[in-house]
Amino acid sequence: MKPAELKRLYRIVKVQLEYGLDELLPEHHLTRAPLLARKSLFWLRNQHADKALGDRLRLALQELGPVWIKFGQMMSTRRDLFPPYIADPLAMLQDKVAPFDGLQAKQLIEEELGAPLETWFDDFDIKPLASASIAQVHTAKLKSNGRDVVLKVIRPDIRPQIDADIKLMYRVARIVAKALPEARRLKPVEVVREYEKTLLDELDLRREAANAIQLRRNFENSEELYVPEVLTDFCNETVMVSERIYGIQVSDLAGLHANGTNMKLLAERGVSVFFTQVFRDSFFHADMHPGNVFVNPNHPENPQWIGLDCGIVGTLNSEDKRYLAENFLAFFNRDYRRVAQLHVDSGWVPLDTNVDEFEVAIRMVCEPIFAKPLCEISFGHVLLNLFNTARRFNMEVQPQLVLLQKTLLYVEGLGRQLYPQLDLWQTAKPFLEKWMANQVGPQAFLHALKERAPLWFEKMPELPELLYDSLKQGRNLNQRLDNLYQGYRQSKRQQGTGKFLFGVGATLVVCSAIWISNQLEPLAIGSATIGVLCWLLSWRAYRQ
């Protein structure tokens, strides 16, 4: 490692130990090497013993920067994996990260827009409405019509922090991939690369604006999801202005109950919104932590989600979607043979994998899980158990699906917070079955025909010319193949001649040696000369 990377690594370890985070790893679970490493850093002691463990974890992640804050945000949504004393403090990372100075934010916005804020806005609030790991949000009113808006600005000097941590993550990922064969199958370098891409995408607010516009168009007039309007005239790389929304934060359970919200329908709509984005639109919001999700307070009996912060989105191609849908349905139906075969067909495990053994392994993992009521099943635990099983069969995690997995965990975590009895499987199953029905059969064929017909009609006038060119190329190809074959035959003949001459030459040279021993010098000299000549001719034949 380079000195700068070693320094950053030491900084990470130092912060974690000074906040007493080694308590998260009980000593009886540690091997000798980590124990020795901890004892060797004896001067690094818990400096915040007066604070609870969850608060110490939150403060440590916040001190380490945006890469770590993002990790904490995901942990906070997994209340089925982490106890409340961990998840509750981490929830503050979603929109309560320590803000930077509001006057500095105003100055940054004015520099980017090229004029004083008063040119376009009134009532700019120096105090931020929300402060997150990447950006900070302030409120104002449009001078032209008095409309309430929010101004989002990227934190200053954040790029060097992210670059340093990502470099270190690459270094560690490469070391782990070389040292641990099991980790290599999980493609740690590719996972870090995907994570880097998502973080860097968040640093360009033009991308977020485009994503928000796309998502808003996808759910236009929808009762399930509302996306605020982006004011594109005021958007650039580090500043974005959008409509201000008024809603109840999805994590404010008391507020939702007080408003009379239908919690069951709200949780089910979260699952529906996720699967609609993935399978209908192939474009999904991939940062659905509670800080980015609000609920429309109007019509609480028919609740509507409000999605903010579209900096991270994911896309899937048709093959990925079909594979995922078939896998989900196979799980729902406990068709473990189908699950195993799909893994082989998709290339996630080697083609020579024993499907029977793989099926048995999956069954052993899933059957105890399905023994519980469906509403108690955690998809997070299913994924963890499946990964442990798949490692035995050399499964490679596909980096392009990492965002999807993370988003599904977010959605499940939110749904279970809103309605603990949420049956994720039964909520999603009808949606997936309907989607699969639209992908196969006569209806799907007619839909594909209708979709492609305009392109076919457009290309039809070109068919005669394309056919003529194909026939001409085919004739030329046949001629070239014939020439290659004749050249090959000529080469084989020359090689045969070369081998024959080499053998004759070798025989004559051996004979010349025998004749010399019998004192027949003239005959030996002639034989040797002819033998050498045969070798030269043989060499020439090979060269040709």
From Swiss-Prot:
Q: Any coiled-coil ranges, and where?
A: none
Any one Gene Ontology cellular component term annotated for this protein: plasma membrane
Q: Which GO terms describe its molecular function?
A: ATP binding; protein kinase activity
Question: Does the keyword section mention Nucleotide-binding?
Answer: yes
GO biological process terms held by the UniProt record: regulation of ubiquinone biosynthetic process; ubiquinone biosynthetic process
User: Where in the cell is the protein located?
Assistant: Cell inner membrane
Q: Where is the Protein kinase domain?
A: 123-501
Q: How does it sit in the membrane?
A: Multi-pass membrane protein
EC class of the enzyme, as a word: transferase
Keyword field: ATP-binding, Cell inner membrane, Cell membrane, Kinase, Membrane, Nucleotide-binding, Transferase, Transmembrane, Transmembrane helix, Ubiquinone biosynthesis
Q: Which residues form the active site?
A: D287
Tell me if Transferase is a UniProt keyword of this record: yes
**Stretches that traverse the bilayer:** 496-516, 519-539
Q: EC number(s) in its UniProt entry?
A: 2.7.-.-
Tell me where on the tree of life, at the top rank, the source sits. Answer: Bacteria
UniProt binding sites for ATP:
L129, A130, S131, A132, S133, I134, A135, Q136, V137, K152
What does the record give as its pathway?
A: Cofactor biosynthesis; ubiquinone biosynthesis [regulation]
Instruction: Please give the function described in this protein's UniProt entry.
Output: Is probably a protein kinase regulator of UbiI activity which is involved in aerobic coenzyme Q (ubiquinone) biosynthesis.
State the family it belongs to: Belongs to the ABC1 family. UbiB subfamily.
Q: What is this protein called?
A: Probable protein kinase UbiB
